[in-house]
């Protein structure tokens, strides 16, 4: 009989292996567009923020993976013309970012390929199994 600790360790290893494989496939897709997973995530966050934009702190708080240097991440996206940033008049330390039309166009071009990839990655699971997986991972997560 497998002990609970062994089952937990096996579950952990399987989650990490699966996540690594899923992200690796997405990385390959994004690489064709000269984007990293982290940059893609930041662009999606800014698209979701809409006209209100988001501060660097807001972006950091919403990232899927912890990103220690959001400022540098946003610098790279701004240099490529995918986002724009502006300092607040009242407090020059406060910087807000918005996605640009070029950034929106890039994401729009990725929406279908990313959705198709996710469908392919989870094709072996039914909708019900996917919903159960999501709930189980939320229970186990931070």
Where are these regions (language model features)?
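Short amphipathic alpha-helical segments with heptad-repeat character
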Residues: 12, 16, 20, 64, ...
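N-terminal helix-turn-helix DNA-binding core of bacterial DNA-binding proteins
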Residues: 24-66
């Amino acid at each position: 009989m497998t002990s609970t600790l062994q089952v937990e360790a096996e579950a952990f290893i399987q989650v990490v292996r699966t996540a690594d494989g899923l992200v690796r496939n997405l990385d390959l897709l994004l690489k064709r567009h000269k984007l990293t997973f982290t940059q893609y995530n930041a662009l999606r966050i800014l698209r979701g923020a809409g006209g209100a934009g988001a501060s660097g702190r807001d972006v950091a708080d919403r990232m899927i993976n912890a990103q220690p240097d959001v400022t540098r991440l946003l610098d790279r996206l701004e240099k490529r013309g995918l986002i724009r940033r502006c300092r607040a008049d009242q407090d020059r330390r406060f910087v807000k970012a918005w996605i640009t039309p070029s950034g929106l166009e890039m994401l729009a071009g990725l929406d279908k390929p990313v959705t198709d990839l996710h469908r392919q990655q989870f094709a072996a699971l039914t909708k019900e199994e996917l919903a159960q997986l999501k709930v189980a991972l939320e229970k186990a997560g931070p």
